[in-house]
Amino acid sequence: MSDAPDTGDKGEAAGKPAGAKPRTEPKAPPKSARRRSRELALQGLYQWLLNRNDIGAIQAHLHDAQGFNKADREHFDALLGGAVREEARLTAAFEPFLDRTVDELSPVERAALLVGSYELVHCLDIPYKVVINEAVELTKTFGGVEGYKYVNGVLDKLAAQVRAPEVSARR
C-alpha cells in the first residue's frame, strides 16, 4: 500500500491508458418534431383540463414557448385543437376501458389518453404501437410513477377496437 495520496485517477491500473478521458454517458437522441408537438399538446391539454381557459390563448402561449420552433406545428395544432374539440367523443371511446371514473384520472393521464386517442382515431399514418408508446413516454415524463402502465393498458384496448385490422395483423 502506498502512502501517496489517492488522486482518484486509476489510469493504467484500472485498465485505461494514462490520460484517457473519463467516459461520459451517451447523449440522448434529439427529440423528433412530432414528439415535441405531443409534449406541448399534453401541456396545453393539462392547462385546459385544470382551468378550462380559452384554448386559443393556451395555443398562442405554447406557440411562443421555448422549443416550439422544433415542434411540428401542424401536428401540435391538430392534437390540441382536435382533442379539445372532440373531448367528449374521445373520452367516450376510452372510458369503457377505465377501472375508475374519468374524474379520478390524474390530469396528466387524462391528457395523455386524449392525445393517444386522438392519434389512434385520426392519425392513421402513425402505427398504433407508436401512438401507444408515445403516450406512455409522455406519461413517464410528466405523470406519476405508475401512470404510464395504466395509459398503456387503456390505449392498447382502445387500439384493438378502433384499429382492429392493424392490431390483428400485428398479433
Swiss-Prot record:
Q: Does the keyword Heme apply?
A: no
Mitochondrion as UniProt keyword: no
Concerning PANTHER family, the annotation shows:
ANTITERMINATION NUSB DOMAIN-CONTAINING PROTEIN, N UTILIZATION SUBSTANCE PROTEIN B-RELATED
One GO MF annotation is: RNA binding
Name the gene behind this protein: nusB
SUPFAM superfamilies, per database record: NusB-like (SSF48013)
Protein purpose: Involved in transcription antitermination. Required for transcription of ribosomal RNA (rRNA) genes. Binds specifically to the boxA antiterminator sequence of the ribosomal RNA (rrn) operons.
- One Pfam entry for this protein is NusB
For this chain's UniProt record, which GO biological process terms are given?
A: DNA-templated transcription termination; transcription antitermination
Segments carrying the region annotation (Disordered) are 1-36
Q: Which organism is it from?
A: Cupriavidus metallidurans (strain ATCC 43123 / DSM 2839 / NBRC 102507 / CH34) (Ralstonia metallidurans)
NCBIfam families per record: nusB
Q: What GO cellular component is one of the record's annotations?
A: cytosol
Q: Give UniProt keywords alphabetically.
A: RNA-binding, Transcription, Transcription antitermination, Transcription regulation
Top-rank taxon: Bacteria
Q: Which family does it belong to?
A: Belongs to the NusB family.
**UniProt name for this protein:** Transcription antitermination protein NusB
